[in-house]
Swiss-Prot record:
It holds the Pfam family LacAB_rpiB. Belongs to the LacAB/RpiB family. GO terms for biological process: D-allose catabolic process; galactose catabolic process; lactose catabolic process via tagatose-6-phosphate; pentose-phosphate shunt, non-oxidative branch. It catalyses: aldehydo-D-galactose 6-phosphate = keto-D-tagatose 6-phosphate. InterPro entries: LacA, RpiB_LacA_LacB, RpiB_LacA_LacB_sf. It comes from Streptococcus equi subsp. zooepidemicus (strain MGCS10565). This is Galactose-6-phosphate isomerase subunit LacA. It comes from the Bacteria. Keywords: Isomerase, Lactose metabolism. Heteromultimeric protein consisting of LacA and LacB. The keyword Isomerase applies. GO terms for molecular function: galactose-6-phosphate isomerase activity; ribose-5-phosphate isomerase activity. Pathway: Carbohydrate metabolism; D-galactose 6-phosphate degradation; D-tagatose 6-phosphate from D-galactose 6-phosphate: step 1/1.
Length: 141
């Protein structure tokens, strides 16, 4: 499993914190950020890299998280969530099989962002009754 990270200029500093943290935690991290590009291009880079391999997960950071969430969910097969707390990050993996989260650097601080990232990447999809929802989401895009 690789954790694919991306950011725009507003999220790059927090993304670097997350990259260092996740590497220290022993995760394989790939940073696809092109700091000269908009959040749309960087979000697409993360989402496409996540979709390249079933086990990949993605985290995209900009100022507020909303824009990247909208971009990511336009891609076929991508289930993403905009999160600002640990529980939502963990639950969106377990119940929604989200493979990507978006964060806002102006919303969450460094420690919260680290907790969110860890909750997301250690979570696992529960399957079962949740698969009906996942199938419905995947039919939409």
């Amino acid at each position: 499993m690789a954790i694919i990270l991306g950011a725009d200029a507003h999220g790059n500093e927090l993304k670097e914190v997350l990259k260092s943290f996740l590497q220290q935690e022993g995760f394989d991290v790939t940073d696809v950020t092109d700091i000269d590009k908009d959040f749309i291009d960087n979000t697409l880079a993360v989402a496409q890299a996540v979709n390249d391999k079933d086990t990949n997960l993605g985290i995209m950071v900009d100022a507020y998280g909303a824009g990247p969430f909208m971009v990511a969910t336009k891609l076929k097969g991508m289930i993403a969530a905009e999160v600002s707390d640990e529980r939502s990050a963990y639950m969106t993996r377990g119940h929604n099989n989200a493979r990507m989260i978006t964060l806002g650097a102006r919303i969450v601080g460094e420690e919260l962002a680290k907790n969110i990232a860890k909750a997301f990447v250690v979570g696992s999809y529960d399957g079962g009754r949740h698969q009906i929802r996942v199938d419905m989401l995947n039919k939409m895009a």
